[in-house]
Each structure stands twice: as C-alpha cells, then as structure tokens.
Amino acid sequence: MSWQAYVDDHLMCDIEGHEGHRLTAAAIVGHDGSVWAQSATFPQFKPEEMNGIMTDFNEPGHLAPTGLHLGGTKYMVIQGEAGAVIRGKKGSGGITIKKTGQALVCGIYEEPVTPGQCNMVVERLGDYLLEQGL
C-alpha cells in the first residue's frame, strides 16, 4: 500500500459511525521533515516547525511555553503522551501528532469532529505502523 493510500483511506476517511465527519487535513511525515504523503489540504510547514515538534517528542514540554506551530498556525499544547503523542487545540479545532519509529502521523480537525475522534483516527494508524516496525 502506498503512503498516500494510508492518508486517503485511514486518515481522511469518514469517522466510524459519523458519516461525513472527517479530518480537515492529514499527513505522514518522516522524522527528518520529508513529507511521505499528505492530503491536498495539509498546510505547508517550515522546517523549524517540524524541528520544534521533534524536539518536543525528545524533550516533552518543549512546546508548552510557545505553542505548537504548523503551517503558520499556532496551537495551544494540551495533554498528550510524553514521547509518543502531541495534541494541540485552536478554537473549535486542533491537531494530533503520533510518533512512530520512522514517521509522524498528523491529523488536523475542526468541528463537528471532536478531539477524541481525531486522536482515535491518528493514533490507530500510528499504532498499526509501530506494529509493522515503521
């Protein structure tokens, strides 16, 4: 399966039991910041934004004072899982980033999608990739 198929079929799909509810944008990005696959709506990000995210995975709490920035959008960092998941909130939407062995699985959402639904979609694919050694 191509990386694009993972984004299209597993991240940008309808959320279980909620037809028509789906993430606003999603991507799979290598630890080096290279985009493996992304939705057409995923924001173009700066290398320093990805560096900040990777630093937060290695040093949890790094982004808390300044916020998580992606594609010029600032998210307030909320409770995640140290070294594994970073979550951010902005207004009625937010972002979930799950770290795997080689990649970051990113999902961005707006209402009516809930934070929990975004977490479920992103973390399920991230956990699957971890099981596959990726």
From Swiss-Prot:
Q: Name one Pfam family in it.
A: Profilin
Which keywords describe this protein according to UniProt?
Actin-binding, Allergen, Cytoplasm, Cytoskeleton, Disulfide bond, Phosphoprotein
Highest taxon of the lineage:
Eukaryota
Q: List the disulfide bonds.
A: C13-C118
Sequence positions bearing Phosphothreonine = T114
Q: Where in the cell is it found?
A: Cytoplasm, Cytoskeleton
Q: Does the keyword Phosphoprotein apply?
A: yes
State the protein's purpose: Binds to actin and affects the structure of the cytoskeleton. At high concentrations, profilin prevents the polymerization of actin, whereas it enhances it at low concentrations.
Q: What is this protein called?
A: Profilin-3
Species of origin: Olea europaea (Common olive)
Which lineage is the organism of this entry classified under, starting from the top rank?
Answer: Eukaryota, Viridiplantae, Streptophyta, Embryophyta, Tracheophyta
